From Swiss-Prot:
Pfam families: GDC-P. The gene is gcvPA. It comes from Nitrosomonas eutropha (strain DSM 101675 / C91 / Nm57). GO terms for molecular function: glycine dehydrogenase (decarboxylating) activity. The keyword Oxidoreductase applies. This is Probable glycine dehydrogenase (decarboxylating) subunit 1.
């Protein structure tokens, strides 16, 4: 199929076929007030060299900041080999591998990805990815309701990423599913067990458990998972994959382990890229696999007894079940998964652990240094991973603006999401930061507070 514009002859023939004399007549049913008219702001055409120069000049305006922002998207070192391999022609495609005999390389890579993610999460099975961490959590909520059958209510702690909570509400609200929020303990920054107990006599399909939570704090995951199971609810873990290299996997939480684990895959070799594309991951227990959305790759043998890979359990998917499918996931984020698989393969378990350990150590060191400054203290007294909340004695938004003016992105202003957390910053320091970076942040903040 040639991808070229229609000729005048093509347009005339198509208009004649539908009984219209012009393209304007074709669209005359659109009210005039809704039509944009001429695109007067579109400039004249430019040469390739002119466009390259313009883009370079605009890129220079972005500046190069020292970033201590996390909140769901993290600056990690990505080995050069990751994207050098990912962008090879064999991988660099959005093709869905329906035709197994022609897609063994892609299918094997996806199978290896599933194996790695299932191992990292301590689960039985993983799918081949979802769109992002937020929509993966929404899919997990839908999955829990399908499995539970008798309840259409989901318990969501306020310590879950606020954007994730918003996405979950958006996706489930038209399916008669109620999202009930659980307050956090203002002293610890964790899910309040006392607040949770007020729902003890009510029925819920699932309890969502973040680890670490949006504040960077480590939750009491064993207690929370057991609470959910004691109430015959499913436990849904929403986790940072980097943290899983150090922390107990969801499959080992409490007496039974979490039932579903989801999260954002961006830390696994995906650049920040102004917010995307990223990918979501999902893993679950074997008994829930038929409720799982998205592609699942299986290993099998062909007629000659040779090992091969193919899409499996396809009866769950939209190209077969249509409206009764478990989701409308299409080609999903295959290229991002390719990069993540290569990233995990290159680093291995020991490398992933070093990334996690150094990120934790850097954030711990940063918080300790900043707490020596008058007017700075931790907002919560709980263990954290590679993010922490700092309480300032001065307006935090002004501090961030002054830091930015000096080339430092100092964190996330939490009162935008939590109005009660006035003058608090969520700061993050991954393995990409060195001692000089931490010292620079500390000294700049010292000068700002002194002024």
């Amino acid at each position: 199929m040639p991808f070229i514009p229609h000729t005048e002859e093509d347009v005339t023939e198509m208009l004649a076929s539908i009984g219209a004399t012009s393209i304007d007549e074709l669209f005359d049913e659109i009210p005039a007030e809704l039509k944009n008219g001429k695109l007067t702001q579109v400039p004249t055409g430019m040469s390739e060299m002119e466009i390259s120069r313009l883009m370079y000049e605009r890129a220079q305006k972005d500046g190069f900041y020292l970033s201590f922002i996390g909140a769901g998207a993290y600056e990690h070192h990505i080995p050069a080999a990751v994207w050098q391999i990912t962008t090879r022609g064999e991988f660099y495609s959005s093709y869905t591998p329906y035709q197994a005999e022609a897609s063994q390389g892609t299918l094997q890579l996806l199978y290896e990805y599933q194996t790695m993610m299932a191992s990292l999460a301590g689960m039985d099975v993983s799918n081949a990815s979802l769109y992002d961490g937020a929509s993966a959590l929404a899919e997990a909520a839908l999955m829990a309701v399908r499995q539970h059958k008798s309840s259409r209510r989901i318990l969501v702690p306020q310590t879950v990423h606020p954007i994730y909570r918003s996405v979950v509400r958006t996706i489930v609200r038209n399916q008669a599913i109620e999202v009930v929020e659980v307050p956090y303990d203002p002293a610890t920054g964790q899910v309040s067990i006392d607040q949770l107990d007020q729902f003890a006599q009510e029925e819920f399909a699932a309890l969502i458990i973040p680890q670490p939570n949006f504040f960077g704090v480590l939750e009491q995951v064993d207690t929370l998972a057991d609470w959910a199971h004691d109430k015959q609810s499913l436990a849904i873990a929403v986790v940072n994959p980097t943290a899983l290299a150090m922390l107990k996997p969801p499959g080992e939480w409490g007496r039974q382990g979490a039932d579903i684990a989801v999260g954002e895959g961006q830390p696994l070799g995906i650049p920040l890229s102004s917010g995307g594309p990223y990918f979501g991951f999902m893993a679950c227990k074997q008994e829930l696999v038929r409720q799982m959305p998205g592609r699942i790759i299986g290993r099998t043998t062909d007629l000659e007894g040779k090992e091969g890979f193919a899409l499996t359990l396809q009866a769950r998917e939209q190209h077969i079940r249509r409206s009764k499918a478990t989701s409308n996931i299409c080609t999903n984020q295959g290229l991002m998964v390719t990069a993540a698989t290569i990233y995990m393969s290159l680093l291995g378990p020991e490398g992933l652990y070093r990334v996690a350990a150094q990120s934790h150590a850097n954030t711990l060191a940063l918080v300790e240094q900043l707490e020596t400054l008058p007017g700075v203290k931790k907002a919560f007294h709980s263990p954290f991973f590679h993010e922490a909340v700092l309480q300032l004695s001065v307006p935090a938004d002004e501090v961030l603006n002054k830091l930015k003016a000096q080339g430092v992105l100092g964190g996330v202003l939490l009162e935008n999401y939590y109005p009660d957390l006035k003058n608090t910053l969520l700061v993050c320091a991954t393995e990409t930061k060195i001692a000089e970076d931490l010292d620079k942040y500390t000294e700049m903040l010292r000068q700002i507070l002194k002024a």
